[in-house]
């Protein structure tokens, strides 16, 4: 369940088999959001809602601190640290596996994995933005994703409706771009966790 929260973030934080299922307005918003993400370089995000946490992004790399779990990904290797049992799992995830753990997989996967439609202007957490609803082309744990962006095409809100009827909500409280993020931020530093048990799955 802890790992599943990664896929809910701006899954980030982030399509259709049949053209008739596409919505031109929704696609334009998603395309512009993806372009803004690519230009933003280093990004620092804080979020609240169902879970509170911090997310740092740079290209394909990310660092996530949420729900008692910290996760680092340097573009090849992923380290996931569970604070409760002081275990670090190390893996080299495949592209397919990254879809379930990369918090910004939505940014690169919406064109192939989702259908989507435009929902108009909505106010979320006191902020007004344009909203798009995405539905997965294949059935799974996620039933739909509601994605709200500002006039600058930065995420304001993400709501993930699960197949069990529950909804996970993420309100973006801070979104800072062009941050100078060192590559070391996206790698696990064993010296900072001397008591952690390393479980190498590579």
Predicted regions and their residues:
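Sec-dependent N-terminal signal peptides
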Residues: 4-14
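N-terminal leader/targeting segments and the immediate start of mature chains
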Residues: 16-52, 56-61, 86, 188-202
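Short, exposed beta-strand/loop patches in secreted or surface proteins that constitute
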Residues: 36, 52-57, 70-71, 116-123
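Gly/Pro-enriched, hydrophobic low-complexity segments
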Residues: 119-194, 199-200
